[in-house]
Amino acid sequence: MHPRAGQPAQPEDLIDIDEVINAYYDLVPDPAVPEQKVVFGTSGHRGASLDTAFNEAHIVAITAAIVEYRRSQGTDGVLYIGRDTHGLSEPAWRTAIEVLAGAGVTTAVDARGAYTPTPAVSHSILLANGAGTEAGVRTTGPGLADGIVITPSHNPPRDGGFKY
């Protein structure tokens, strides 16, 4: 167990959330700098806005690519989108919804505008695709649903994450 488990955050752990969010909108990644490119790891794209590694331009590009991918695969069902409490999750959520709406993608969000746990998004997709029915879960065909979860998971508070 970590020696600080269960202890209050220390001053050096705290972030300036306004600085983090402003950097999300204000800093523009340079495609010539490898650390500023979109990079998908084992669980989506993660990075920090202050490092120009998770910014609005990244989310616009990733979401536009998802729209193109959905079209190429014939995925035309609801896209479920959720977010967690990290500081960059809400701005990335808003950006993604704007891109999806502009592309005409039917999108489902929490009715209260609240945070949505990853398992809730996964469960919604499975139900929409036939889980619990006699036919079972579909993986192709008209009306197929999918989703986006905006969370860097266990990463530090200054980070953002985007998973499809």
Give a label for each model feature.
Residues 11, 18, 68, 72-158:
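N-terminal small/polar loop signature for handling phosphorylated ligands or for N-terminal nucleophile
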Residues 158-164:
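A short, gly/pro- and small-residue-rich
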